[in-house]
Amino acid sequence: MGQTSANDNNANLKYPTLDKRIKETFVANSAATNKNSLYDSYLRAIRWSIDRLGDSGVMVFVTNNGWIDGNTAAGFRLSLENELSDVYVLNLRGNSRTAGILAKRERGNVFNIRVGVSITLAVKREIPDDVCIHYRNIGDYLSADEKLAIVDRSTLDNVDWQIIEPNIYGNWLDQRDEDFESWPGLGKGCVR
């Protein structure tokens, strides 16, 4: 019958060296309970690429955009902050796994897939500076064609980038209030 899925011949491939690096960086920086998603293939590719940059270089990825504000991905974002000089993220949105007004705001997906999409360009300089996170949300209610037209005419210089000041938890967007940590825990077993 042949191969029915791309994973048929690749199920559970092990990458011991790469997974060790992910454990030392993304996982070590994460406070999430379940860290399995940090071993996702696109995060593996980014970890591999950062390590291959050496002292300096540039990398670009088009990926799922869930890492931008996902709780589990805070360790990944903290690693980007620690290891890179500039990170440019163009959030193309398009997450159709939402409902109501949020689904209307996300609207068109540039690849006609269910998850949102982002373009990330990262720069690593030989002499490290504090990282600068450049973020742009492409906008609300845009069709896939409108988003692609914006991408087509965009350059690093003409995009109105928002400079993100990450907090100590690795939050870039929707940052939590730091006073929250001083509040007493609720429920049994909650100890700070």
Show which residues each predicted segment covers.
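Sequence-level detector for compositionally biased, low-complexity segments
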Residues: 9, 17, 29-32, 48-192
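Mobile active-site "lid"/loop adjacent to the S-adenosyl-L-methionine
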Residues: 2-38
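Alpha-helical packing segments of well-folded alpha/beta enzyme cores
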Residues: 41-45
